């Protein structure tokens, strides 16, 4: 049997692995155009939304590693707004910029519009979310980093 190309995640602080992966997705979205052939650049939306999901999940992994629990059940995948609220219940500092814009990106992510052709009323230009995504990555990093 061949060894895996990539070793399994065995870091003593797995939340850092989740956050590093979030940054990879965010970095790939940088510089991509918002519109391609007259259509929204759906891969850019996917990269941004997935970066957000992984960054939020880094907070959840951090809490789980520390033995913390939030009230209620963890929200399902792809509902970025609910995941963010859950992470805030675990101590992540709420950010008004993120709250204002996350609902729109969450809707696109939750309905898989960026992955599969579907009709969705109004779609915001992906670069409108850049500042909120960067703020979220900064906030989650501040929350999980080892001091």
Question: What kind of feature is each model-predicted range?
Answer:
Residues 27-43:
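Helix-loop segments that flank and shape redox-cofactor active sites
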Residues 41-61:
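Short, hydrophobic, well-ordered secondary-structure elements
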Residues 1-20, 26, 64-147:
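Long, charged low-complexity segments
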Residues 20-21, 58:
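Short N-terminal helix-initiation segments at or just after the protein's N-terminus
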